[in-house]
Amino acid sequence: MSAASKKSLHNKIALVAGATRGAGRGIAIALGEAGATVYCTGRSSIKSSAKRSDTPGLRETIEETATLVTAAGGRGIPVRVDHTIPADVKKLVTRIQRQHHRLDILVNDVWGGDSLTEWSKPFWKVDLSNGLQMLKQAVHSHIITAHYAAPLLLAKPARAREHPIILEITDGDAFYYRGNLFYDLVKISVIRLAFAMSRELRKRGVVSVALTPGFLRSERVLDHFKVTEATWKAVGKRKNKKKNSGDQNDAPSDFMVSESPRFIGRAVVALATDPKVMEKTGRVFSTWNLAREYNFTDLDGTQPHWGNYARKRYGKYKICDDTFYSYWTPGLIDLVFPDWF
């Protein structure tokens, strides 16, 4: 990240829903690095009760994330919220309204579906309750949060060079099948959610986009491969020399093009500070393409490009490009009711 971007979000108010770990934590810290006040929400808290804590065995908390945000140069505010409970979200938004009277950035990153995803099983053989819970956690929560937060995003007059923004965090920048029916529904749904919200917000000056990381080097991934952020590269290179070792903890070759959670965080900052970001509303973007457009890097100074790697290793796949979006707009509702929203 260039020095010019430091404090570029000073006095901005952000809400990162699902900031405990992974992409959410990386985004929250990057927003703090840019000087923002960041509400860091989630269920995993030092104050968690046994019934409402997040996935057992995971050590990260929202308080820790908030501390990291403040250390990066912003102001981190931890708030324990279950985003599937409307009353919880309404209470949070009421607090932000009372304290700041507006919201500039909303990041919907609530997920928690790793333990619910049953790979290599067709939909009629998976645990239905797990699949429905995944939809509740990772789609319903996003809708609930956007519903209550939208009036605060709209409360700030849209100036010519400044737009409040909603970012939906997903997996993948295309409409290919993602290997599990419920996982697929979640990741495609939030892309569509960003688009649908953009149609209702665009004339009001609020931007709505979806954003995907590449191979995310999250805390859980580092733990799985028994490495740290400091050792992952050397260990990955060594393990990749072993072919078909059978060790499930051996890092795949894909791991060498992975990105830290701060990479997607810097993508969020780039979008939030772009005066022309309204031109992007309604679409899905990737960290690797935005890094080249906005000239930001990962923590190690690199610009990992998952798209190029995937095409080289697995073959070409079609992303959501201009041709793809030409089928989305204008739609029949736009043609019949041109003043709709």
Model-derived regions: residue spans:
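The beta1-alpha1 cofactor-binding region of Rossmann-like NAD(H)/NADP(H)-dependent oxidoreductases
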Residues: 57-63, 80-92, 128
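A glycine-rich helix->loop->beta "capping" turn
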Residues: 72-77, 95-108, 114, 127, ...
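Canonical Rossmann dinucleotide-binding motif of NAD(H)/NADP(H)-dependent dehydrogenases/reductases
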Residues: 6-48
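Rossmann-fold cofactor-recognition segment
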Residues: 67-85
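A short, exposed helix-loop element centered on a Lys and neighboring polar residues
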Residues: 146-147, 195
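C-terminal helical subdomain
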Residues: 210, 227-339
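Catalytic loop of short-chain dehydrogenase/reductase
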Residues: 112-116, 124-134, 154-203, 212-229, ...
